[in-house]
């Protein structure tokens, strides 16, 4: 089981072009995939494939730094916006690079350049809330540990009762990424379940039910 990183990259590309109002000749800088990290390749491929299919005249520039820390990405983004002063947007496939790039562009006075990130972290969410509708950290797909945990339990139950048998190594269940945007930042909860509850709420309800059962047993 894993999140569909390719779909996440496509979501990021779609959000990027939404931010740019469908600019046909947009110039977008992408932090190039790291060969040793499979998910980075899927995210970048999803982004670039979607761009090629939907905006063939857009220029997508792939480049990367050997320093993947927040500070390293800050320096990288500063160099990239200097080399490509007309860039319209950046796509970064993990949180540290997202934040490093965002702050680099802000500090460089490039406050009209959009940033599409990844991981949908609380840090990114707060930047969006503080920036409001004009925030240039526009969107960020991400993964919900709680939802993945729930799905894992469901599959374990199916395995134990014999209703599910894996067909092979390629039989991988992929979950659709969550999407944090400037439009939903104030209400976004990456761990919210489809029924509106969160894992914490469900745990609390379970604990309460167990306490009631214990009380009833004691009364008997």
Give a label for each model feature.
Residues 2-9, 37-40, 44, 66, ...:
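Solvent-exposed, acidic/flexible segments
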Residues 2, 27-32, 61-62, 88-92, ...:
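Structural recognition of the beta-strand scaffold that forms the well-ordered cores
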Residues 1-26, 73-74, 98, 121-125, ...:
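Hydrophobic alpha-helical segments within soluble ligand-binding/sensing domains
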Residues 88-89, 103-146, 150-176, 182:
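Exported/periplasmic ABC-transporter solute-binding proteins
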Residues 31, 35, 39, 50, ...:
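Hinge/cleft segment of the Venus flytrap/periplasmic-binding protein
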Residues 46-47, 62-127:
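Hydrophobic alpha-helical
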Residues 8-15, 38-58, 72, 76, ...:
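Short, solvent-exposed amphipathic alpha-helices that sit
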Residues 16, 20, 32, 51-55, ...:
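Sec/Tat-exported extracytoplasmic proteins
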């Amino acid at each position: 089981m894993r999140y569909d990183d390719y779909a996440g990259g496509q979501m990021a590309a779609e959000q990027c072009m939404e931010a740019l109002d469908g600019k046909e000749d947009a110039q977008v800088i992408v932090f190039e995939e790291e060969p040793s990290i499979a998910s980075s390749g899927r995210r970048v491929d999803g982004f670039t494939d979607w761009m090629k299919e939907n905006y063939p005249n857009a220029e997508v520039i792939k480049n990367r730094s050997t320093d993947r820390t927040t500070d390293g990405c800050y320096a990288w983004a500063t160099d990239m916006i200097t080399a490509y002063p007309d860039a319209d947007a950046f796509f970064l496939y993990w949180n540290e690079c997202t934040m490093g790039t965002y702050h680099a562009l802000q500090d460089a006075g490039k406050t009209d350049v959009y940033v599409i990130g990844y991981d949908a972290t609380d840090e990114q969410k707060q930047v969006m809330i503080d920036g409001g509708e004009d925030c240039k950290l526009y969107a960020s797909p991400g993964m919900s540990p709680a939802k993945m945990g729930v799905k894992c339990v469901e599959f374990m139950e199916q395995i134990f009762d014999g209703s599910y048998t894996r067909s092979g190594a390629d039989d991988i269940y992929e979950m659709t990424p969550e999407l944090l945007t400037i439009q939903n930042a104030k209400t976004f909860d990456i761990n919210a379940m489809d029924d509106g509850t969160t894992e914490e709420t469900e745990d609390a309800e379970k604990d309460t039910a167990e306490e009631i059962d214990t009380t009833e047993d004691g009364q008997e």
